[in-house]
């Protein structure tokens, strides 16, 4: 006999299969069901597939994000500003981990930063892979993350450690082997509850969805970025589309490397073979000894981070500050301290 609770879950899946959108409350209820190991995997797969085929709506992303936040292991940080640079991933371009490096640049200039990230699923190296290769202990606990934010202004939060409930959807996501709503929700579910963020999006069509969801979730400021030729980063190979979210308003514009005072770079120069190469190039770039193309790529993304956090009034000034910090080796010095702190040293 099916109880009323199970029936309500089934009806939500049925609603999706009929092409109807869910309210944020309904989406949160469905997400909570999907994070329950006892909920039927075939219904989980049906719901995820229906959302993907029809196209996820902002309210649905909001509901799923709220459900993940409710289940997260919290990192209790009380500062006025907290930055993240986590994006959706999935661009498949295998470029240097610019958003991870950008987080360190921003933190080295005094912007408190909790970088939320995971291992790679579609690229040669995810943010967690690179941080680990740099010597960082990605498995430290939440209390250490809080101490690091208080003393260094930086920490890295390895997503699986802070979202243990996500284990319940791993088998289904693996079988589907495609992007699902959880890829969109991940950047919006930082367990430290940051209030400013740069969110890279690999598909331009998803930019309004993420921007609207971020607005509904109450962020103070967000830049949703999509760079040529389809990267979830600020690009130095061409134009970057931006949706800027501030106080509930969304503004659309584009920037080029020239607008930031940075050189245009070929995509080939930014590609890496694996996490080892990405980490080594990030290490050299952050110490001011890297390739100029890597420096420009990192500086462009750091500029977005510094601007959204209110460190600089415009993106060009933010890029100049990022380049100066990199050439002075400030992010490398912070990285060294963060690695030691993550290990409890």
From Swiss-Prot:
Its EC number is 2.4.2.18. Its cofactor is Mg(2+). Anthranilate 1 binds at residues 87, 118. It catalyses: N-(5-phospho-beta-D-ribosyl)anthranilate + diphosphate = 5-phospho-alpha-D-ribose 1-diphosphate + anthranilate. SUPFAM superfamilies: Nucleoside phosphorylase/phosphoribosyltransferase catalytic domain (SSF52418), Nucleoside phosphorylase/phosphoribosyltransferase N-terminal domain (SSF47648). It comes from the Archaea. Anthranilate 2 binds at residue 173. GO terms for cellular component: cytosol. Mg(2+) 1 binds at residues 99, 233. 5-phospho-alpha-D-ribose 1-diphosphate binds at residues 87, 90-91, 95, 97-100, 115-123, 127. Keywords: Amino-acid biosynthesis, Aromatic amino acid biosynthesis, Glycosyltransferase, Magnesium, Metal-binding, Transferase, Tryptophan biosynthesis. Signal peptide: none annotated. Mg(2+) 2 binds at residues 232-233. Pathway: Amino-acid biosynthesis; L-tryptophan biosynthesis; L-tryptophan from chorismate: step 2/5. GO terms for molecular function: anthranilate phosphoribosyltransferase activity; magnesium ion binding. Homodimer. Catalyzes the transfer of the phosphoribosyl group of 5-phosphorylribose-1-pyrophosphate (PRPP) to anthranilate to yield N-(5'-phosphoribosyl)-anthranilate (PRA). NCBIfam families: trpD. Belongs to the anthranilate phosphoribosyltransferase family. This is Anthranilate phosphoribosyltransferase. The lineage of its organism: Archaea, Thermoproteota, Thermoprotei, Desulfurococcales, Desulfurococcaceae.
């Amino acid at each position: 006999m099916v109880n009323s609770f199970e029936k309500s879950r089934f009806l939500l899946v049925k609603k999706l299969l009929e092409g109807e959108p869910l309210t944020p409350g309904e989406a949160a209820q469905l997400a909570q069901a999907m994070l329950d190991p006892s909920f039927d995997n075939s219904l989980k797969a049906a719901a995820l597939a229906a959302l993907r085929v029809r196209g996820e709506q902002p309210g649905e992303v909001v509901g799923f994000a709220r459900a993940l936040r409710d289940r997260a292991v919290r990192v209790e940080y009380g500062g006025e500003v907290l930055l993240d640079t986590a994006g959706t991933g999935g661009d498949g371009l295998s470029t240097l981990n610019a958003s991870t490096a950008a987080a360190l640049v921003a933190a080295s200039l005094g912007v408190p930063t909790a970088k939320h990230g995971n291992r790679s699923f579609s690229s040669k190296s995810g943010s967690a892979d690179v941080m680990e290769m740099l010597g960082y202990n990605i498995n430290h606990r939440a209390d250490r993350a809080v101490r690091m934010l208080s003393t260094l202004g930086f920490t890295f939060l390895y997503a699986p450690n802070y979202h243990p409930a996500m284990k319940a959807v791993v088998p289904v996501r693996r079988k589907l082997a495609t992007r699902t709503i959880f890829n969109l929700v991940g950047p919006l579910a930082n367990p430290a509850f940051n209030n400013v963020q740069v969110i890279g999006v690999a598909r331009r069509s998803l930019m309004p969805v993420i921007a609207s969801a971020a607005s509904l979730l109450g962020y103070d400021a967000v830049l949703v970025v999509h760079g040529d030729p389809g990267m979830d980063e600020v690009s130095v190979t061409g134009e970057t589309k931006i949706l800027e979210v501030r106080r509930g308003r969304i503004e659309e514009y584009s920037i080029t490397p020239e607008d930031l005072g940075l050189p245009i770079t070929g995509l080939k120069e930014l590609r890496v073979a694996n996490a080892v190469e990405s980490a080594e190039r990030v290490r050299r770039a952050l110490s001011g000894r890297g390739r100029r193309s890597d420096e420009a790529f990192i500086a462009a993304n750091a500029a977005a981070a510094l601007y959204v956090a209110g460190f600089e009034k415009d993106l060009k000034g933010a890029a100049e500050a990022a380049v100066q910090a990199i050439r002075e080796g400030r992010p490398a010095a912070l990285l060294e301290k963060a690695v030691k702190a993550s290990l409890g040293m």
